[in-house]
A protein has these predicted regions:
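Phosphate/NTP-binding elements of NTP-utilizing enzymes
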Residues: 1-182
Length: 182
């Protein structure tokens, strides 16, 4: 059904920060099944399609999970939202499980952590979901966050990288400290 922010009021700040130009990334770590993917990932996709069209890359933990997310959550959302479905390109060649084109020319890529997904394309928005399940080094090229963030640099202050995760890994940098609320 429709998003109801009163059920997850703790998601409002991170969601709003996604459009704040003074930040180039949002990293949200929280328990499983608390609205992170629906609010941050799916909500950001829909917001972008309807309110602020731009190319976007969504990276799931594996190719199988990318396909599943596209075929279940995104396909259902697109089908049941008149505002989204009327913007989707009607051409069969424009839409498949990993690529979605829209009438305004914007593009949504649903991928997985591989150097080919993280190379040679620019996206204003990049979202990494279930980051704790990503490999620590993607195809010998570095961590997924650094690779993903490079995709948004062309867009300067309007580029944004989102990482959503559960606390599934030990902290490796014990000197890191949060510098502020965001």
């Amino acid at each position: 059904g429709p998003w109801e922010s009163s059920l997850t009021p703790y998601m409002i700040d991170p969601i709003n920060t996604l459009s704040a130009r003074e930040y180039d990334a949002v990293v949200f770590v929280g328990p499983a099944r608390t609205g992170k993917t629906e609010g941050l990932i799916d909500g950001w996709i829909v917001y972008g399609i309807i309110c602020d069209p731009a190319d976007m890359l969504v990276v799931q933990m594996t190719e199988t999970k990318a396909r599943e997310h596209s075929r279940t959550r995104l396909s259902r959302t697109f089908r049941h939202s008149p505002e989204v479905s009327k913007r989707l390109s009607p051409s069969r060649n424009d839409n498949n499980v990993h690529d979605k084109m829209f009438l305004d020319g914007s593009f949504l890529k649903i991928g997985w952590p591989s150097i080919t997904v993280f190379s040679s394309s620019d996206y204003r928005r990049v979202a990494l979901t279930d980051y704790d399940r990503f490999p620590e080094n993607v195809d010998g090229e570095g961590d997924a966050f650094t690779l993903a963030s490079k995709r948004t640099t062309t867009f300067m202050s309007s580029g944004m990288t989102l990482v959503e995760s559960s606390p599934g890994r030990d902290i490796t940098d014990t000197k890191w400290r949060c510098g502020g609320a965001h």
